[in-house]
């Protein structure tokens, strides 16, 4: 640990966190430590992995989906994963009487989500709200570790910001200092990032097995050597029931502490989502996003990520999420929209998808790497061009031909389709 400035002669309560986000706690964190912005302010991780493998998996039918989600490294008061603690330190307090005592606690909305541990010689000890620090302890300066029991789900509930309050009481004298922290946002991956794992469902459908074989071959040609990871579900649409993201917190020397997150689509009756709980492990959590039943607009096929960019003076270093809204009856559930609004770092772009039956943005827009100033380009479905192909076929005398060759597709001719306004 780096030394902090020596304590003044007169008693002063001082608490620091990694406000400047350099992965260390020292005097450089003193400025604006009670403020929090996109550029400055201490970060906490929602410690939702399963380091010891103590949580049950999706095959345990005695547990509900909510119970499976509830088990993680922060679901009790033990330090299961201290590597993901945010460092907090108090400056030594001198000039106190032997009867003086101190407290450290999270205050304000959401305080119950914050866990605080104190580092003792024998290891980390959970520090409850009613525990007191002795005058002797206060005189030495102390180290704490802080994490969160949960992610940020909705600003209407909690925006993830918390205040740690350090209070020293010596008779009638009360000294107080504060530092502001916020739970790390869940950031969605974009298509410029290098893949290190590729997931596919385990399906018995011949057409899906063929797809998996083709995908495996394409990955091999691209130089991807890791084996395909499997979801234990026959739901073919992995893109629809899960989106992957991560939370990160600065560590020393430019490194970062990262917890990966599998985000279940807000379709609680879509059973495939339960299979995600098998992924939970060290530094890997699974979260549910609420929702109601199984509505297509809440599929994560209706979610993409614009890669990082700058435009008109605005910067989006983590990119932006993009989803579709088809209006009454086909709009995403409020749990869906609230979740992505609450993260703050990937300001959503909303597109009109009312012209689509399924109303998913991934049906007509994708973002691809490109050799240009942005490093990416947009692939957009050209619907007018498709109609022009049909009109040309009609003009060439093929109006009676079937539009679709698949036997389960709508049976209509080119003439019928073009006449349907």
Predicted regions and their residues:
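Histidine/cysteine-enriched polar flanking segments
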Residues: 1-421
């Amino acid at each position: 640990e780096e030394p902090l400035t020596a304590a003044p002669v007169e008693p002063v309560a001082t608490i620091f966190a990694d406000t400047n986000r350099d992965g260390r706690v020292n005097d450089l964190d003193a400025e604006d430590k009670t403020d929090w912005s996109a550029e400055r302010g201490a970060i906490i991780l929602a410690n939702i992995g399963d380091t010891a493998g103590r949580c049950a998996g999706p095959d345990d039918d005695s547990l509900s989906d909510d119970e499976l989600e509830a088990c993680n490294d922060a679901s009790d008061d033990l330090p299961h994963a201290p590597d993901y603690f945010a460092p907090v330190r108090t400056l030594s307090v001198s000039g106190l009487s032997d009867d003086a005592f101190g407290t450290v606690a999270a205050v304000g909305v959401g305080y119950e989500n914050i866990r605080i541990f104190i580092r003792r010689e024998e290891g980390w000890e959970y520090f409850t709200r009613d525990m007191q620090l002795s005058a002797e302890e206060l005189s030495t300066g102390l180290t704490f570790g802080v994490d969160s029991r949960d992610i940020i789900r909705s600003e209407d509930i909690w925006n993830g910001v918390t205040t740690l309050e350090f209070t020293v009481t010596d008779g009638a004298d009360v000294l107080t200092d504060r530092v502001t922290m916020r739970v790390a946002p869940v950031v969605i991956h974009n298509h410029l990032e290098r893949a290190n794992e590729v997931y596919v469902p385990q399906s018995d459908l011949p057409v899906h097995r063929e797809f998996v074989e083709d995908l495996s071959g394409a990955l091999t040609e691209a130089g991807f050597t890791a084996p395909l990871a499997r979801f234990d579900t026959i739901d073919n649409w992995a893109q629809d029931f899960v989106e992957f993201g991560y939370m990160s917190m600065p560590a020393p020397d430019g490194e970062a502490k990262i917890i990966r997150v599998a985000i279940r689509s807000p379709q609680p009756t879509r059973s495939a989502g339960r299979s995600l709980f098998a992924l939970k492990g060290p530094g890997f959590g699974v979260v549910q996003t609420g929702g109601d039943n199984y509505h297509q607009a809440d599929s994560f096929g209706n979610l993409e990520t614009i890669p990082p960019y700058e435009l008109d003076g605005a910067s989006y270093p983590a990119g932006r999420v993009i989803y579709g809204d088809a209006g009454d009856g086909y709009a995403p559930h409020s749990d869906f929209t609230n979740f992505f609004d609450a993260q703050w770092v990937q300001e959503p772009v909303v597109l009109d998808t009312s012209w689509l039956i399924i109303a998913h943005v991934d049906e007509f827009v994708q973002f691809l790497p490109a050799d240009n100033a942005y490093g990416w380009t947009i692939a957009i479905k050209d619907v007018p061009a498709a109609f022009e192909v049909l009109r040309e076929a009609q003009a060439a005398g093929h109006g009676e031909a079937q539009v679709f060759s698949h036997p389960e597709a709508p049976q209509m001719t080119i003439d019928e389709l073009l006449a349907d306004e």
